[in-house]
C-alpha cells in the first residue's frame, strides 16, 4: 500500500484504521513517501512493515530510527524500471492525487491549467503502473478551474495505469477494469462515468479556453 504526497491521498491514511478494525484487516507492508498516520498504524500492529524512500513529516523521520520494522530503501529499490524486484511492482493499492484528470483517465501532476510548472511527478507514474489498483483522489474543481477535464495539459501518468478516480461529486471507474466495476456494484457503491464528472465540473466553473503555445520547447516528458 502507498499514498502520494497530495493532501487528499495522504488523508486516506487517517481513515484506514477504523475500516481495518471493522473488517479484521492487517496490511502486510506499506511503502512511500511515509507520514505520521502510517507510522501510527505500524506502531499499533496494523501494518507489518514500513519501507520508505522519503518522509513527509517529522513523525516519519523520527520513526525510521526508533521503530522496529520501519526500514529505509534506495530509489533504485523503490522504482528503478530496470530492477525486476522494484517495490512499486509489488503494490496492491496506491492512492494518489492529481492536478488534472481527463476523460481518458490521463493524470497531470506537473503543470497547472495555464501550462506553468507546478510540481513534480515523484513516484506517481511508477506506482500507478506497478500497482494492482491505482486510485486518484482529487476535488472536482479547484477555485474556478475544473480538475476533471477534456484533456490534461501534460500527461504525467497515462490513463491505462489509472483505475479509479474519486471526487467530491462521485466516483468513476476506468472501463478497462470491469472487475472493479463489478466489485463496486456488489458493494452498493454508486459510480458514474468520467465524462459525467467532466460535464459537472464544466457546469460549475465553465469550459476552459484552449491554451495557446509558443514555438519554444522548454521540456519533453
Describe each PLM feature range:
Residues 3, 10-20, 24-28, 37-221:
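Conserved phosphate- and dinucleotide-binding cores of soluble alpha/beta proteins
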Amino acid at each position: 500500500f502507498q499514498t502520494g504526497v497530495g493532501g487528499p491521498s495522504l488523508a486516506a491514511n487517517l481513515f484506514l484504521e477504523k475500516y481495518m478494525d471493522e473488517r479484521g484487516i492487517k496490511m502486510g507492508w506499506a511503502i512511500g513517501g511515509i507520514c505520521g498516520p502510517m507510522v501510527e498504524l505500524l506502531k499499533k500492529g496494523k501494518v507489518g512493515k514500513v519501507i520508505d524512500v522519503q518522509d513527509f513529516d517529522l513523525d516519519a523521520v523520527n520513526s525510521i530510527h526508533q521503530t522496529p520494522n520501519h526500514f529505509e530503501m534506495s530509489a533504485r529499490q523503490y522504482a528503478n524500471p530496470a530492477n525486476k524486484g522494484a517495490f512499486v511492482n509489488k503494490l496492491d493499492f496506491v492512492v494518489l492525487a492529481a492536478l488534472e484528470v481527463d476523460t481518458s483517465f490521463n493524470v497531470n501532476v506537473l503543470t497547472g491549467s495555464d501550462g506553468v510548472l507546478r510540481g513534480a511527478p515523484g513516484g506517481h507514474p511508477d506506482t500507478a503502473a506497478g500497482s494492482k489498483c491505482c486510485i486518484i483522489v482529487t476535488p472536482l474543481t479547484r477555485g474556478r478551474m475544473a480538475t476533471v477535464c477534456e484533456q490534461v495539459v501534460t500527461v504525467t501518468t497515462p490513463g491505462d495505469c489509472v483505475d479509479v478516480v474519486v471526487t467530491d461529486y462521485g466516483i468513476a471507474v476506468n472501463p478497462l477494469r470491469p472487475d472493479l466495476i463489478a466489485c463496486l456494484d456488489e458493494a452498493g457503491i454508486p459510480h458514474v462515468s468520467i465524462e459525467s464528472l467532466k460535464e459537472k465540473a464544466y457546469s460549475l466553473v465553465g469550459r476552459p479556453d484552449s491554451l495557446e503555445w509558443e514555438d519554444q520547447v522548454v521540456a519533453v516528458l
